[in-house]
Regions:
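Flexible, solvent-exposed coil segments and beta strand-coil junctions
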Residues: 9-16, 43-50, 86-94, 107, ...
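Transmembrane beta-barrel wall of Gram-negative outer-membrane proteins
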Residues: 58-164
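Transmembrane beta-barrel strands of outer-membrane/channel proteins
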Residues: 16-22, 31-33, 47-53, 81-87, ...
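C-terminal transmembrane beta-barrel domains of outer membrane proteins
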Residues: 190-350
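Outer-membrane beta-barrel initiation region
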Residues: 1-82, 118
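Transmembrane beta-barrel outer-membrane domains
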Residues: 24-28, 59-63, 74, 101-107, ...
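Short loop/turn motifs that connect adjacent beta-strands in outer-membrane beta-barrel proteins
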Residues: 10-12, 40-46, 75-80, 117-125, ...
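Extracellular loop and loop/strand-boundary signature of outer-membrane beta-barrel proteins
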Residues: 19-21, 54-56, 94-99, 136-146, ...
Length: 350
């Protein structure tokens, strides 16, 4: 007679997620580790911690950063709090003199979103954010400057989707945002500086998805309008490695611009000689636009790249191999590499 024993998974195992990566070469090392958990303290909340440490022997630099974040519901609101601290040290050579320079930074950010109303299948949400950062810069253990940065914004987001016949699904999103940015620097030996300005931006995004001949086809894009006083944190990235392989580490972020991406996923199939491993292929093409601007007349133009990816999915691991190449670049912010961009990533369950 067979005997069956019930095994129950520990409640922490289903909630904790670990991540990490390490880059080690002759110049130095760069490593990071993170842990995240869902519904650990209360229902529908999320908490996470990240730490990064990097050292470069060639540049004689040493830096580290740590941050913790917590997202939780409060009545009809979704609140997110994030706090972090970072430091760096590096050697500076100036006019034959070599000395040590260092800096520290402390940051706190709070954001909230709230559903407002819904009309004609479109949901409207209110968004508010505030963040502050205090930094110090020193040379040879003597204070050079203290700076303070503050950023506040409020906005309205409208989003909606519709499923048409034959499996065609379309989604749209519009974000209108306005706010103020404040930056001040105190110098012990010279005049202080203060800079405060307002800004606005409007961003449109849309996607269309459909399954055809068992392949999943998607077209999605984003375009942004903004004034020239927009903080760099609100810039839109129109081309770069975070979007597609093929740009060989180059990235372009601008005040106003947009991008359009077409990609397709193959149906999954079993890998031969690899029991329980499924694989699929992805083809993608992306093009970014930078409109002409008198303030940045040397950056306008286009950049495009294509990518082929192979994904392997096993019971306890996921592996991705991507090969991309830039097709063309008419903006001076990028150059067309003479070799393809190859990436490999793997994640394993613990």
């Amino acid at each position: 007679m067979d005997t069956f024993q019930e095994e129950r998974e520990h409640w922490l195992r289903s909630r904790l997620k670990f991540s990490g990566k390490t880059k080690l070469n002759s110049d130095g090392l760069d490593g990071s580790v993170g842990v995240a958990a869902d519904s650990l303290v209360g229902q529908n909340d999320a908490i996470g911690f990240d730490y990064r440490d990097a050292r470069s022997y060639g540049n004689d630099t040493d830096s580290s950063a740590a941050s913790i974040r917590y997202r939780f519901p409060a009545w009809a609101n979704q609140l997110r709090i994030e706090a972090g601290r970072s430091r760096y040290d590096h050697a500076v050579s100036d006019a034959g003199r070599r000395y040590n320079a260092s800096g520290e930074s402390r940051a706190l950010a709070v954001s909230a979103s709230r559903p407002l109303f819904s009309r004609f299948g479109i949901a409207f949400d209110g968004i508010a954010r505030h963040q502050g950062r205090d930094s110090t810069f020193s040379e040879e253990n003597s204070l050079v400057s203290e700076s303070r940065y503050q950023f506040s914004s409020v906005g309205l987001e409208a989003s909606g989707g519709h499923e048409f016949g034959a499996g065609l699904v379309a989604n749209t999103r519009v974000l209108a945002l306005s706010g103020r940015e404040f930056h001040s620097t105190d110098y012990p030996s010279q005049d202080d500086t203060v800079d405060e300005r307002g800004f606005y931006k409007v961003a449109f995004s849309a996607s269309v998805e459909q399954e055809l001949f068992q392949w999943n086809w998607r077209v999605n894009g984003r375009y942004q309008f903004a004034d020239e006083d927009l903080p760099s944190s609100e810039y839109i990235t129109v081309a770069g490695p975070s979007m597609l392989a093929g740009f060989n580490g180059q990235s372009v972020s601008v005040v106003s611009g947009g991008w359009l991406r077409l990609d397709t996923d193959s149906p999954a199939w079993s890998m031969p000689l690899m029991d329980g491993v499924l694989s699929r292929v992805n083809f993608a093409v992306l093009q970014g636009w930078i409109p002409y601007s008198g303030a940045r007349e040397d950056r306008f133009g286009k950049a495009s790249a294509g990518q082929v990816s192979l994904k392997l999915q096993g019971r306890t691991f996921t592996a991705n191999v991507s090969v991309g190449r830039m097709i063309r670049a008419s903006t001076t912010a990028m150059t067309t590499p003479d070799h393809p961009d190859v990436r490999f990533s793997m994640s394993m369950g613990i």
